């Protein structure tokens, strides 16, 4: 099984880099109008983009969203990302750690990040595996120890699992996560005196307000909305499928999901803890819009993956451009800091207006 997972990780990297896997429909952030300040009353050079997330100070509200791990090629990618986030004082998440839990030889493809950064690093485990594979608090402990994680993302990916040839389909009984997360912090927080925040993470399909209510009840500390508009994992799996009938079936779901902006607005109705916006974040203005409507931080994945394949310097340049654009947008809105941005006025129009 470990070889199958390792090969699948490599296929995912190849498809994401060389195939068209992005949604054709947008994030609906284009339907968010930020309010220009004709006066500004700010000094562009003094704009403060820093935030505190999960007890870590970040230079900007940006994390490199979970991308990869579990293959030798992934080690170099995670290394390049870690170098970049350390340079810029940002955060990152690793890809699903299941491969390394099955095959310990793959652990270094994840743990390499701690050779290059002490910044915020989030672990990653699949929600479905707690049901299908009987994972528990000990599994979480192993994943945390593997990368000295500052938080643990539990990802929900029903669409990908439904289309993936090797998919796990049983998400029934996800309520078991409540006891598992509580037991983890009771057992291991006492030993390390380090409470691990748990993040419910979508991977491109988005969460609804009903989802947010359930996740809040389960005790999650944060929600990463992972809305549609960026990478479509249905598209990624479409390119992997060999059978033509299965391809036709999967093609119907290439545009499925709640757009990122809509998911932010949905989730914040029933969740008052940190919201992370991922899914089609492609500019500093996207970050500003996401935070104005309810996010506390944003994540970027696919553009960083492509840059990381070239090297850490390309990752740094890419994210520096995002930060510069974010600062300029805040300056034009008259926002000196992120708190002011998060409390700024905005206008919702067109299709996004139908979600509120």
Swiss-Prot record:
Q: What is its EC number?
A: 5.3.3.2
Give me the residues that bind Mg(2+), please: 161
**Keywords on record:** Cytoplasm, Flavoprotein, FMN, Isomerase, Isoprene biosynthesis, Magnesium, Metal-binding, NADP
Positions binding FMN in this chain are 66-68, 96, 124, 201, 231, 280-282, 301-302
Q: Where does substrate bind?
A: 8-9, 96-98, 160
Where found, per UniProt?
Cytoplasm
Q: Where is the signal peptide?
A: none
Cofactor(s) the record lists: FMN; NADPH; Mg(2+)
Q: Which GO terms describe its molecular function?
A: FMN binding; isopentenyl-diphosphate delta-isomerase activity; magnesium ion binding; NADPH binding; oxidoreductase activity
Q: Which GO terms describe its cellular component?
A: cytoplasm
Record's Pfam families?
A: FMN_dh
Q: Which InterPro entries match?
A: Aldolase_TIM (IPR013785), FMN-dep_DH (IPR000262), IPdP_isomerase (IPR011179)
> Which Gene Ontology BP terms does the record give?
isoprenoid biosynthetic process
Record's catalysed reaction(s): isopentenyl diphosphate = dimethylallyl diphosphate
As for family, the record states: Belongs to the IPP isomerase type 2 family.
According to the record's subunit comment, the protein's assembly and interactions are: Homooctamer. Dimer of tetramers.
Quote the function comment for this protein.
Involved in the biosynthesis of isoprenoids. Catalyzes the 1,3-allylic rearrangement of the homoallylic substrate isopentenyl (IPP) to its allylic isomer, dimethylallyl diphosphate (DMAPP).
Q: What is this protein called?
A: Isopentenyl-diphosphate delta-isomerase
Gene that encodes it = fni
């Amino acid at each position: 099984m470990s070889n199958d997972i390792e090969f699948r990780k490599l296929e995912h990297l190849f498809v994401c880099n060389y195939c068209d896997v992005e949604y054709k429909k947008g994030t609906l952030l284009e339907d968010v109008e930020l309010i220009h300040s004709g006066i500004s009353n700010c000094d562009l050079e003094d704009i403060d983009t820093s935030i505190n997330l999960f007890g870590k100070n970040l230079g900007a509200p940006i994390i490199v969203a979970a991308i990869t791990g579990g293959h030798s090629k992934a080690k170099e990618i995670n290394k390049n990302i870690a170098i970049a986030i350390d340079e810029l004082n940002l955060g990152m998440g690793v890809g699903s750690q299941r491969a390394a839990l099955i095959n310990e030889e793959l652990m270094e493809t994840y743990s390499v990040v701690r050779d290059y950064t002490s910044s915020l690093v989030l672990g990653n485990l699949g929600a479905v595996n707690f049901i299908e594979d009987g994972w528990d608090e000990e599994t979480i402990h192993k994943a945390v120890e593997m990368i000295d994680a500052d938080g643990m993302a539990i990802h929900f990916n029903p669409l990908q699992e439904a289309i993936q040839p090797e998919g796990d389909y049983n998400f029934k009984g996800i309520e078991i996560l409540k006891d598992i997360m509580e037991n983890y912090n009771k057992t291991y927080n006492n030993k390390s005196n380090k409470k691990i925040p748990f993040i419910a993470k979508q991977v491109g399909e988005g969460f609804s307000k009903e989802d947010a209510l359930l996740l809040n009840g389960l005790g999650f500390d944060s929600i990463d909305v992972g809305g549609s508009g960026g990478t479509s994992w249905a598209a990624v799996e479409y390119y992997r499928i060999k059978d033509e009938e299965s391809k036709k079936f999967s093609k119907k779901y290439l545009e499925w999901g709640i757009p990122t902006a809509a998911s932010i607005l949905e989730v914040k109705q029933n969740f008052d803890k940190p919201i992370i916006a991922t899914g089609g974040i492609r500019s500093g203005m996207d970050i500003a819009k996401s935070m104005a409507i309810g996010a506390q931080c944003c994540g970027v994945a696919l553009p960083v993956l492509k840059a990381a394949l070239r090297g850490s310097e390309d990752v740094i340049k890419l994210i520096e451009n995002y930060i510069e654009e974010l600062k300029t947008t805040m300056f034009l809105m008259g926002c000196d800091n992120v708190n002011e941005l998060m409390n700024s006025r905005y206008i919702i129009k067109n299709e996004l207006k139908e979600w509120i």
